[in-house]
């Protein structure tokens, strides 16, 4: 699995990536990382589908984007990617829920909490993000299976009123 770690403190990047690597080794799942010192650096290089999850420090460098604003901009690019906030303070917890994070990890991150979070990520990613539906192109034509992103579904209506 490929993770992005957005953290301005090198020692926190190394600590978190080490814990993730340990947990993945126990589970027999390979893990690799791309680390970014700022929200701006991360967003400049972000490509949808490149990461399975983003670990994002809320209290990034005061001169740039904080983690909440980085997450807001990220959500414009990818609605489904799991965001896990890391923080030493809970002051922004309520504001952070606006971007629908998968989890919050309080620093210093505890290995057992991280193990639970990584399992949560795997379960989240196991849910399909796309359906395949048959679409007919005309009378008598064989239906063709087309992918439909779950993010594109606004509502579903069932004209059948009886069960």
Label for each model-derived stretch:
Residues 1-4:
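Non-catalytic signal-transmission and effector/linker regions of two-component phosphorelay proteins
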Residues 7-9, 88:
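Acidic di-acidic motifs
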Residues 9-34:
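Two-component/phosphorelay signaling modules centered on CheY-like receiver
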Residues 17, 32-53:
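Acidic, metal-coordinating helix/loop segments flanking the phosphotransfer/catalytic sites
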Residues 23-31, 57-68, 72, 137-143:
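Short, charged helix-to-loop "capping" segments that act as catalytic/coupling loops
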Residues 44, 51-129:
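CheY-like receiver
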Residues 116-163:
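Conserved binding/recognition cores within well-folded domains
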């Amino acid at each position: 699995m490929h993770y992005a770690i957005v953290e301005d403190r090198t020692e926190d990047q190394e600590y978190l990536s080490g814990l993730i690597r340990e947990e993945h080794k126990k589970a027999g799942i390979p893990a690799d990382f791309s680390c970014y010192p700022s929200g701006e650096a991360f967003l400049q290089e972000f490509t949808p589908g490149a990461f399975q999850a983003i670990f994002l420090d809320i209290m990034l460098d005061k001169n740039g984007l904080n983690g909440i604003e980085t997450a807001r901009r990220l959500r414009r690019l990818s609605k489904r990617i799991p965001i896990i906030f890391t923080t030493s303070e809970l002051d922004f917890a309520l504001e952070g829920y606006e971007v629908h994070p998968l989890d919050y990890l309080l620093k210093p991150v505890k290995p057992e909490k991280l193990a639970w979070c990584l399992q949560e990520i795997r379960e989240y990613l196991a849910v399909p993000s796309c359906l395949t539906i048959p679409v007919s192109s005309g009378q008598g034509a064989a239906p063709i299976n087309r992918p439909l992103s779950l993010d594109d579904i606004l509502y579903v209506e069932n004209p059948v009123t009886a069960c």
